[in-house]
């Protein structure tokens, strides 16, 4: 990269940072952070743990966004200094460092811009992701397990926490259905575009004739909603079933009827949860999933 190109890239980055600062409204965000910090120091802050966690998540999200932006600005200023030094006196080693720094900052600015674009009402929420294989038996179930590994690894690489809410293993391989709760700032914003039917065409390892098979898996993505979102669900509209948990888990698996299945009769919407030892906790999680679906 020539010095002329470096200068052009630095000018473009300066404009982007100015635009970001304008859209971020740093002063308003810093005021909100101060408000949240005050809430968190209140003696009764932990009386309502769910509300407390919502405040903590909002605070962490704001702090991360503001701190990352300030870090990007500092990185840009350092690159400007390096550029001036190289312009005054040629230094091959410093030129290489400058070029690498410019490329890295461009990449980080692109990531930051994507985060700013995730500004829809529920983008910042945790995500509930469901995978359901289509017709095709073991072949589709194996494809579902591949997608499960992909989403799990992607989430872990981004620093998100993954919890398995419901898991039904396949008869020979793969999974018949799985529901994940993916926790992290902007988890739903990043994952919402994954909703739809995912198709795989391959020579099947389960077909002794080596024929080509097409497999389908439907993917549902919903935001996890907190109690601030009011959805009227009447008790008489619900059918609640309990059953024994299955799949990977602790000692409670297959020993108690801790798993919950809730059917919303007017819409025939069904949700299941078996991730917790407690039937009460599974019911709470299932109700959150039902609210998200409705």
Swiss-Prot record:
It is found in: Cytoplasm. GO terms for molecular function: translation release factor activity, codon specific. This is Peptide chain release factor 2. PROSITE patterns: RF_PROK_I. Pfam families: PCRF, RF-1. One of its GO terms (biological process) is viral translational frameshifting. Keywords: Cytoplasm, Methylation, Protein biosynthesis. PANTHER family: CLASS I PEPTIDE CHAIN RELEASE FACTOR, PEPTIDE CHAIN RELEASE FACTOR 2. InterPro entries: PCRF, Pep_chain_release_fac_I, Pep_chain_release_fac_I_sf, PrfB. The keyword Zinc-finger does not apply. The gene is prfB. GO terms for cellular component: cytoplasm. Methylated by PrmC. Methylation increases the termination efficiency of RF2. The modification N5-methylglutamine is found at residue 251.
């Amino acid at each position: 990269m020539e010095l002329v190109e470096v200068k052009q890239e630095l000018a473009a980055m300066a404009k982007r940072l100015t635009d970001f600062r304008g859209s971020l409204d740093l002063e308003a965000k810093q005021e909100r952070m101060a408000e949240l910090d005050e809430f968190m120091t209140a003696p009764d802050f932990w009386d309502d743990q769910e509300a407390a966690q919502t405040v903590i998540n909002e605070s962490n999200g704001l702090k991360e966004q503001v701190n990352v932006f300030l870090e990007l600005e500092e990185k840009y200023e350092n690159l400007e200094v390096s550029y001036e030094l190289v312009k005054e006196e040629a230094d091959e080693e410093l030129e290489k460092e400058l070029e690498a720094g410019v490329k890295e900052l461009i990449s980080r600015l692109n990531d930051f811009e994507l985060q700013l674009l995730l500004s829809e009402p529920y983008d910042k929420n945790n995500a509930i992701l469901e995978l359901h294989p289509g017709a095709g038996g073991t072949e589709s179930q194996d494809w579902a397990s591949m997608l499960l590994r992909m989403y799990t690894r992607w989430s872990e690489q981004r620093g998100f926490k993954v919890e398995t809410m419901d898991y039904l293993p396949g008869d020979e391989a793969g999974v018949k259905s799985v529901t994940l709760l993916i926790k992290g700032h902007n988890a739903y914003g990043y994952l919402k575009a994954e909703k739809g039917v995912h198709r795989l065409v391959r020579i099947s390892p389960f077909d002794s004739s080596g024929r080509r098979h097409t497999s389908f898996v439907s993917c549902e993505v919903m935001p996890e909603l907190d109690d601030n979102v009011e959805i009227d669900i009447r008790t008489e509209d619900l059918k609640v079933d309990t059953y024994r948990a299955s799949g990977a888990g602790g000692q409670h698996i297959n020993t108690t009827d801790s798993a919950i299945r809730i059917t919303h009769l007017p819409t025939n919407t069904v949700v299941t949860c078996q991730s917790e030892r407690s039937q009460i906790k599974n019911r709470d999680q299932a109700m959150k999933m039902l609210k998200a679906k409705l």
